[in-house]
C-alpha cells in the first residue's frame, strides 16, 4: 500500500510556532466539550449551564458510545459545529425530589352508592401534603423576538395572523396581546430533563376570549426545574435505527388548518395540548401530545373560491395526536391542501393524526378527551398499541384508538348505549396508572401494596368541573380528583372529589378587576411525574408534580406527596360491580357548587372589610 506523504514548509519559524499553538488550542477546546461530564457531577453541569447560558447537547443515558466520542459523533452524523464552551454529555441525572416545604391538605371524595332519587353523598377524606405554587412562564418578549428573528418557514406561515408583532416588540406592548398558558410536562428519564409544552396565544383585541391563533411552545427544564435556555437532545429517529437532534426552547411546527381570509368566529392553532409518554414498537418512551384543533371538512369544494372568501367550507374542532419527535411532509391531513399553501408540501411538520369516533361520526366540536394507557396491554405486547380516552365521565364512555395504525376509534366501554351527554365534569390531566408506577420499584414491604392491585388496574387524574354562573363570575373551573378502576373487563369511576384549590392564590381574569368579574379559573393541565422514594422510617413515600394554569395566563407547577398512600386502603380500591350510576359525579358537582357559593360570599365579605 502506497502511503501519501504531506510536506509542511512554513515561510517562517514564527508561522510554524503560531500554527502549532492554534492547533493545540483547538484540540484542548474540543476535548473540553466532552470532558465536562467526566469532571463534573450532574448538578455541577447544570450550574455551569445556568451561569454561562451555554449550549448543552444531551445524549440518552443508554447511548452506545464512549463519552470522549460524543462530540465526534455529533459532528460526523449531523454536521453540527460545536463552539468553545459548549457542553456535550451522556445523561446520568436521576430524578431529584423537590426540596420544598409541604403543608397538609384535605379534600372530600364521593363514591357511587345509593340511587339518584335517594342520593347519599357520604364524604371520604383524602389527606396529602402540598407545596406552594411555582410559576414557569417564559419571557414572552424574548421568545417572540427570537421567533421573529429566526424567520423560519413556520414563522412565515403563521405570522400573517400577527402582522403587528414587530411594532409590538418595538413599543413593548407584547403583554397586551400575547399570553402563555396550559403548560403540561413529562420527565424524560433517559435525558434527565422535564419537557414542557404550553400554548402561546395571540389576541388582536387583547381579550383572551377572542384569540386569533395558538402556537405550541416547548421548553426543557433540568431536574431542579431550572429552564435550559439552549439545549439539544439526541433522540432516536423512529424506524430508521438512527438518531437525530431536536433543540429547545422552540415553537414547534404542528400542522393545522387555517385561512387568514376567514377569521371571524375561528380560533386557529393547537388548543389545550396535553403531553404524555408512550412506549413505541422500538421499545423506548417518546413524548406524545393530545390536543384539539380546527380541521376542515374533506376536500370536495372549490379551494380557489375559499381563498377568495367566496365560499365558507365546514370546519370541525377535532381531537389530534402528535408525535413531537416524528415528522411528516406537508399538511394535507389537516384539510389544508389549498393553492396558496402548496409550498407547505415540502416542509417538515410534526407528525399528527386526527382521531375519529366509531362509524365516522363527526360532531361539530370535540374537546376534553382524557387520555390513558392500559398497562396490562403494554406488558403483554411489549409496547403501547393503543391510546384510551375517557370520552365522557358521566355515563362513563371510553374510546380505544390505535397509536400506530390508521382507522377510527372504537368503543372500549360504555355504561349505557344511549347518546352520551357531556356533563360539567370534563377532562383535565391525563390518567396516571398506579399499577405501572408500583412496578417500577421493589422496596421492602411494597409487595403487600401490590397485592391490593391484583386483578384490577387503577388510574388517578385531576379532571375539572366547569360551572356557569354558580355565584362567582361567569364561569368557575377548579380541579376534581378522580379514581378510575378496571376489573373484570368493566370500568368504574369509583371516586370523584369536590372542588380543590391547593390554597393557590387565584388571579383576576382581567388586570384591575375583581376575582368574581369575568371568569375565575384554576385548571389542571398535566401530571408531570409521579415517583416513589424510601422514607426515613423504612417505608416509602410518593411524590407528584402537577401543572396548573390560572386565569388562562400562567404556567404553574405544584408539588404533592402522599396521594398514593392515602388511596391505599381496601375501602378506596373496592369496586361494586352491581353499581352503575353517576352518583359520585352528582355529589361532587353539588359540593363544588357549594364551594363556588362560599367562595363568592367570602370574597365579597373580604371586599367589604377592605373598603371599610
From Swiss-Prot:
Give the membrane topology: Single-pass type II membrane protein
A Pfam family:
BMT
Q: Which residues lie on this side of the membrane: Cytoplasmic?
A: 1-12
Span-the-membrane segments of this chain are: 13-33
Q: What is its EC number?
A: 2.4.1.-
Residue spans, topological domain Extracellular: 34-612
Q: What induces it?
A: Expression is induced in biofilm.
Location in the cell reads:
Membrane
* Record keywords, A-Z: Cell wall biogenesis/degradation, Glycoprotein, Glycosyltransferase, Membrane, Signal-anchor, Transferase, Transmembrane, Transmembrane helix
Cystine residue pairs: none
According to the record, which residues are glycosylated?
A: 224, 230, 480
Q: What is its main location?
A: membrane
GO MF entries = mannosyltransferase activity
Q: By its UniProt entry, which InterPro entries does this protein fall under?
A: BMT1
* Cellular component terms (Gene Ontology): membrane
BP terms from Gene Ontology = cell wall organization; glycosphingolipid biosynthetic process
- What does this chain do? Beta-mannosyltransferase involved in cell wall biosynthesis. Required for beta-1,2-mannose transfer on phospholipomannan.
As for family, the record states: Belongs to the BMT family.
* Protein name in the entry: Beta-mannosyltransferase 5
The protein's organism comes out as Candida albicans (strain SC5314 / ATCC MYA-2876) (Yeast)
